[in-house]
Amino acid sequence: MYQDLIRSELKEAAETLNNFLSDDANIQSIQNAAVLLANAFKAGGKVISCGNGGSHCDAMHFAEELTGRYRENRPGYPAIAISDPSHLSCVSNDFGYDFVFSRYVESLGREGDVLLGISTSGNSGNIIKAIAAAKAKGMKVITLTGKDGGKMAGSADVEIRVPHFGYADRIQEIHIKAIHILIQLIEKEMADQ
């Protein structure tokens, strides 16, 4: 009944992954991001992650697997996803939704920390403001974007961009794969210290 649709969806997902994989710059960006994060942890820094909608879920997923565990038992790493409902509703109400992430970064970010901003379009105003706040604090910035990178293109120390121009779910599928690889590489870097 739906087998052709299922095959088509899985085929498109595989093609998106293969296109991403075929560009060595994408592989290098993931490696650079992992090393940047591990070096921040080694120096006593933390990562603050943020995103909207499904990307918000990815930001939380990233943080929980760093503070909790991924595949192996090991010490937790300092990671915070900006997801506190009281913070989000307060700042949205009092300042506007564009400031929900930047206010948090202004409050808790410091030099030596890393911001991970996730936006499939690269055009999320609140992530753009968070990037500016992070830079003002002397933080490093990693972005996970899609399409042409949008307004966030070129704004990060490391950008992992999925150059897919279709629906956002394909971009999100690569983002979560990149997140899992980042954690795997961070664990390796931290174990090798």
Swiss-Prot record:
GO term, biological process aspect, one: D-glycero-D-manno-heptose 7-phosphate biosynthetic process
Keyword terms, alphabetized: Carbohydrate metabolism, Cytoplasm, Isomerase, Metal-binding, Zinc
One GO CC term, this protein: cytoplasm
Residues in SIS domain copies: 37-193
Biological pathway: Carbohydrate biosynthesis; D-glycero-D-manno-heptose 7-phosphate biosynthesis; D-glycero-alpha-D-manno-heptose 7-phosphate and D-glycero-beta-D-manno-heptose 7-phosphate from sedoheptulose 7-phosphate: step 1/1
Cofactor(s) annotated in UniProt: Zn(2+)
Principal cellular location given in the protein's record: cytoplasm
Subcellular location: Cytoplasm
InterPro entries to which the protein is assigned, alphabetical: GmhA/DiaA, Phosphoheptose_Isoase, SIS_dom, SIS_dom_sf, SIS_GmhA/DiaA_subfam
Cysteine pairings via disulfide bonds: none
Note describing how the cofactor binds: Binds 1 zinc ion per subunit.
NCBIfam families tied to this protein: gmhA (TIGR00441), PRK00414.1 (NF001628)
Oligomer and partners: Homotetramer.
HAMAP family in the record: GmhA
Protein name: Phosphoheptose isomerase
Organism (species): Pectobacterium atrosepticum (strain SCRI 1043 / ATCC BAA-672)
